[in-house]
């Protein structure tokens, strides 16, 4: 009798708990569906947001963790309008809320202050009005806050100064008013974070507040002119906007500089100023390091600390005085008069490109003889090293991680092309330049080191930069680079991810195979040997349909004509499952009627196998 009574109670308890669990599991889905109902979606990007599905992790533009909690909502540049909803505050585990470049209006819900795990809040380039919620000061893990290019009004909440993790702040191009806070995390931000808010005043701007004494913004640091010695003729250009006071001071005490010069070790080829005369200079969170700091960090650029070598110079592992690990890129370039100004300008541009999937520039060092860039150290190396140089004791990249790398790197490149002004063309997209952070999230590195692309014009270079096997045919033959140059390199990188092979490998000649990875892949596809393409390290632990989809994206990206390649923003959408089937079907129809595409011979590259061979509408679907 007692056992029967317990059984009855157990059944009743289950009837109570199961609905409660369903409600809890579906809370995030309900919150996102509320957002969908408040948004106008002309392109149907939210079509997969089905409220009948308990788990929103199956929806496009939504990313979940292993516990099926929503950690990312990515709806940037989706032509959405409407308003946000307070229910967004129920996404307790959300880390990234990306709603930039839409037409969303109304106020920013104060409930966003409940998202205490939020790392990045990107609402820029919308039509938001009203004040910045004071509750955003609760987001103590927030690193990126970009609310620029809206119509926000009122004062800047002082609560934001308590967010010590804040690295990037952009409130520019709004209607904010009052005094800019200057304490806490705000002490490191420059006027560029608050530009084009006519009613703002205070030290964070160039305008003093009423009743306050006038002030002059601090001038940018002006590097000293090196001491002249026999056989030396180096000189430096002035930094734009700098003043000559610092240089004049140094010339007033030449004995100090000369004494320092005499104390240098004969084998050193550096020129630096004493640490006490090289104050820290911050551009937002960008630090200017002294050369001595980086010499100490890298053990005087010891060969044992070399992480890699590339077309731009060597990269050294270093440990700063605070114990943090960094990667120091020591650039090799010819010194030209005025080069300091150009270098600082490019450094500032690179530092403004901040995205989860871009390698963040931590600082720089500039002397008359040295140019160095300081980045966070990526402990998991590059995709190339993980594919082909991993120790036997470490597991290979699994298929799920490779898919994440494909999507993350696409998002990073899309940001460089569509959200940087001027846009940044990478020009050397390859597996070796896709780094992996501690969570194996893709981080695009080495961007901005080539000449920056002007917003409107195609950049023509006298020297083609890039790596054999990754260079787009039109770039190799004409020297003209564009976003589509990067798209081609990205497509080759996808093939590296799928196959584990190098983009150019003479070893394939031993089997009478093509040395170019793209041609090798196309040859196997013509023979319908898809299983031969996949990296053996995966040991068949992959999903066939996902491999096919990734190959389709790679082939679309590596078409011979740059005009026929998708933009990186389109690539992101295709990887998220939006529009790939239609684009692939369209491509197949064109290939059926198209004759063999012949490009003109590449300049100085007769040995290169043409990578634009017709695939005759290769089928990548159906049973095998």
Swiss-Prot record:
Transmembrane feature ranges: 238-258
InterPro entries: Kinase-like_dom_sf, Leu-rich_rpt, LRR_dom_sf, LRR_N_plant-typ, Prot_kinase_dom, Protein_kinase_ATP_BS, Ser-Thr/Tyr_kinase_cat_dom, Ser/Thr_kinase_AS
Biotechnology: Over-expression of a truncated intracellular domain of BAK1 induces partial suppression of endogenous BAK1 expression, leading to an erect leaf phenotype. This could be a potential tool to improve rice grain yield at high density planting.
Glycosylation site positions: 103, 114, 127, 149, 175
Molecular function terms, GO-annotated: ATP binding; coreceptor activity; protein homodimerization activity; protein kinase activity; protein serine kinase activity; protein serine/threonine kinase activity
S-S bridge residues: none
Sequence ranges of the LRR repeats: 91-115, 117-139, 140-163, 164-188
Record topology, Extracellular segments: 26-237
Keywords from the UniProt entry: ATP-binding, Brassinosteroid signaling pathway, Cell membrane, Glycoprotein, Kinase, Leucine-rich repeat, Membrane, Nucleotide-binding, Receptor, Repeat, Serine/threonine-protein kinase, Signal, Transferase, Transmembrane, Transmembrane helix
PANTHER family xref list: SOMATIC EMBRYOGENESIS RECEPTOR KINASE 1
Subunit structure: Forms homodimers. Interacts with BRI1. Interacts with REM4.1.
UniProt-recorded name of the protein: LRR receptor kinase BAK1
């Amino acid at each position: 009798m007692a056992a029967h009574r317990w059984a009855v109670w157990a059944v009743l308890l289950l009837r109570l708990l199961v609905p409660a669990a369903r409600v809890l599991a579906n809370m995030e889905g309900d919150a996102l569906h509320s957002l969908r109902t408040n948004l106008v979606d002309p392109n149907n990007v939210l079509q997969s947001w089905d409220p009948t599905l308990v788990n929103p992790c199956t929806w496009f533009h939504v990313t979940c963790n292993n516990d099926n909690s929503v950690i990312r909502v990515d709806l940037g540049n989706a032509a959405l309008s409407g308003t946000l909803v307070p229910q967004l505050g129920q996404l307790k585990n959300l880390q990234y809320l990306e709603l930039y470049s839409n037409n969303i209006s109304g106020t920013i819900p104060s409930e966003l202050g409940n998202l205490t795990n939020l790392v990045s809040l990107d609402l820029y380039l919308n039509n938001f009005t009203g004040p910045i919620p004071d509750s955003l000061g609760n987001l103590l893990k927030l690193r990126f806050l970009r609310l620029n290019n809206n119509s926000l009004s009122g004062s800047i909440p002082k609560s934001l100064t308590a967010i010590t993790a804040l690295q990037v702040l952009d409130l520019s191009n709004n209607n904010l008013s009052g005094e800019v806070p200057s304490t806490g995390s705000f002490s490191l931000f420059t006027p560029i974070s608050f530009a084009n808010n006519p009613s703002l005043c205070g030290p964070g701007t160039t305008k003093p507040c009423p009743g306050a004494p006038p002030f002059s913004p601090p001038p940018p640091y002006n590097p000293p002119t090196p001491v002249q010695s026999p056989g030396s003729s180096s000189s430096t250009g002035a930094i734009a906007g700098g003043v000559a006071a610092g240089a004049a001071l140094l010339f007033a005490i030449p004995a100090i500089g000369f004494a320092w010069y005499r104390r240098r070790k004969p084998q050193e080829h550096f020129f630096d100023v004493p640490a006490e005369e090289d104050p820290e200079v911050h551009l937002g969170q960008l630090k200017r390091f002294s050369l001595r700091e980086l010499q100490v960090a890298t053990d005087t650029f010891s060969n044992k600390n070399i992480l890699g070598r590339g077309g731009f110079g060597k990269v050294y592992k270093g440990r700063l005085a605070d114990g943090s690990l960094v990667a120091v890129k020591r650039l090799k370039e010819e010194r030209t008069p005025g080069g300091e100004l150009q270098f600082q300008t490019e450094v500032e541009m690179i530092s403004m490109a901040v995205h989860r999937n871009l390698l963040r520039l931590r600082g720089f060092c500039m002397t008359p003889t040295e140019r160095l860039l300081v980045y966070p150290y990526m402990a998991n190396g590059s995709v190339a090293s993980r594919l082909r140089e991993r120790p036997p004791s470490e597991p290979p990249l699994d298929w799920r991680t490779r898919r994440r790398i494909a999507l993350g790197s696409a998002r990073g490149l899309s940001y460089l092309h569509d959200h940087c002004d001027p846009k940044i063309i990478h020009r050397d997209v390859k597996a070796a330049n896709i780094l992996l952070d501690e969570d194996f999230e893709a981080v695009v590195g080495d961007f901005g080191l080539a000449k920056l692309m002007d917003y409107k014009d195609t950049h023509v270079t006298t020297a083609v930069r890039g790596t054999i096997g990754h260079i787009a045919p039109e770039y190799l033959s004409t020297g003209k680079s564009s976003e589509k140059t990067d798209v081609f390199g990205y497509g080759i990188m996808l093939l590296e991810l799928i196959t584990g092979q190098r983009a150019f490998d003479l070893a394939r000649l031993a089997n009478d195979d093509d040395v170019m990875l793209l041609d090798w892949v196309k040859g196997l596809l013509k023979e319908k040997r898809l299983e031969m393409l996949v990296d053996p390290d995966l040991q068949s632990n992959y999903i066939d349909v996902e491999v096919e989809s990734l190959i389709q994206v790679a082939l679309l990206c590596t078409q011979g004509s740059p005009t026929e390649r998708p933009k990186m923003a389109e690539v992101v959408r295709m990887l998220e499952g939006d529009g790939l089937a239609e684009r692939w079907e369209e491509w197949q129809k064109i290939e059926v009627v198209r004759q063999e595409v012949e490009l003109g011979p590449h300049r100085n590259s007769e040995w290169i196998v043409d990578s634009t061979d017709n695939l005759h509408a290769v089928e990548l679907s159906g049973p095998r």
